[in-house]
Design a protein with these regions (language model features):
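Active-site helix-to-loop segments that bind/position phosphate- or nucleotide-bearing substrates
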Residues: 1-96, 100
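Feature targets compositionally biased, intrinsically disordered low-complexity regions
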Residues: 12, 125, 180-182
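Conserved active-site and cofactor/substrate-binding residues in soluble primary-metabolism enzymes
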Residues: 24, 28, 110, 114, ...
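Generic secondary-structure signature for well-ordered alpha-helical cores
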Residues: 31-38, 124, 128, 198-201, ...
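Conserved mixed alpha/beta catalytic, RNA-binding, or beta-rich assembly cores of soluble enzyme
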Residues: 70-136
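Short terminal or interdomain "cap/linker" segment that borders an active site or interface and mediates
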Residues: 82, 129-205
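Short conserved micro-motifs at the rims of enzyme active sites and ligand-binding pockets
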Residues: 90-91, 205-208
């Protein structure tokens, strides 16, 4: 399990150097995570359909996803999760020790992001094409409703135990689906936080 303490502190809203009490809390949360985090990952590679833009016969909606994929000819669909044990432990601590619960939630988020980065790097190492940073449903005008298609095409319930609620939320909560564009000339870094139109997100990274 790989953690990113800098990211954990950012998720906790810590600016500047953390105090000793905060560091001790994060260390406890990292220990908790070691016992309850069980990362799983799955992916599928598809040729990118044009006119209309589509993956696996499913149209992709929105101008932002079209712009993201303009220099791609293939698409990886990916999904990752930390499992239900992490969610159960977070929920338990939120009731019994709220500060630790919040810290564990932040640690798990950073672990999931680091895990996804590692898996995407492995995909890049196994590909002759350039891979773009991942792009998820809900970024820009790429609708969250396409989460249904991601879950269906990846068969996430059977493969990694990830399901979708009627409100389009993934379960377990610490789960992510995304697309990764691939192409010989693929380039661009206008994804992730930069692609999201939300201006008041507390977790939006500072971009220089």
């Amino acid at each position: 399990m790989k953690t990113n303490r800098r990211e954990t502190l950012r998720y906790l809203g810590v600016k500047g150097a953390p105090d000793e009490r905060t560091l001790a809390l994060v260390e406890r949360a990292e220990q908790e995570a070691e016992a309850c985090v069980f990362p799983r990952f799955t992916f599928r590679l598809f040729p990118l359909g044009r006119e209309p833009l589509s993956v696996g016969g499913t149209p992709l909606e929105g101008a932002d996803i079209a712009a993201y994929l303009k220099d791609c000819d293939e698409v990886y669909l990916i999904a990752a999760t930390l499992g239900f044990e992490a969610e159960k432990r977070i929920n338990f601590l939120m009731q019994s020790s709220p500060a630790l619960g919040v810290a564990l939630d932040a640690v798990c988020t950073s672990v999931l992001e680091s895990f996804l980065d590692e898996q995407c790097q492995k995909l890049q190492e196994g590909s002759k094409k350039r891979l773009k940073p991942r792009f998820s449903c809900g970024y820009g005008d790429f609708p969250l409703s396409q989460q249904r298609d991601m879950v269906r095409l990846l068969d996430t319930g059977r493969k990694i135990g990830v399901f979708l609620s009627e409100s389009l939320m993934l379960a377990p909560q610490k789960s992510v689906t995304a697309l990764v564009g691939a192409g010989e000339r693929a380039r661009g870094k206008s994804e992730g936080c930069l692609a999201c139109g939300k201006k008041d997100c507390a977790f939006k990274k500072e971009l220089k």
